Amino acid sequence: MRGIRKAFGATQALDDVWLDVLPGEVHALIGDNGAGKSTLMKILSGATQADRGQIWIDGQSFEPHDPRHGRKAGVAMIYQELSLAPHLSIEENILLGIEPSKGPFLQWDEIHKRAGAAMRQLGLNHQAPSTRVATLSIAEQQLVELARAVAVGCRVLVLDEPTSSLSRTDIERLFSLIGELRDRGYAVVYISHFLEEVKEVADRFNGLRDG
């Protein structure tokens, strides 16, 4: 990301921000609430458009118009407020909107296969794919969100304050999983305002203050 600027009315949220994130690393963004961390990542994922600046992914210029476009280019952002459908199963949530079909019919064998592969990568294979998401813990629901991103081929995973609702045990499991994703070549962007967490999980970090 090069020279990113974003204003909301008279408030300058981001002012000439530069950021490099590499494959196979956990890169943290740290700063107080309102520093611009989430806004910067919303621009990367397509949820918000920059006023000025450039984004490059794998050497290609990238101008995301919306989150669907961002995911198609390989970028997924997991928010504090999860966007799952609680009445649907784990596997239905993982492939929601991208269900393999033939004509008007869903290909359930392919759904089971693809969802199962994503669940194994994210350590969810102890759960039945048919389990309703509403019955899962917050930590497990977070993993379903990550599995959804992995299933569509995203290689840049943005986690926005992911530990805010987790116990210490769940945090340790999440950090272990983040390390596994890094070792598989994923670029993980970790947004936090807790310096101790950043020291524990990140390979590099950038600080933001007032954009």
What do the PLM-derived regions correspond to, one by one?
Residues 1-211:
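Glycine-rich phosphate-binding loops of nucleotide-dependent enzymes
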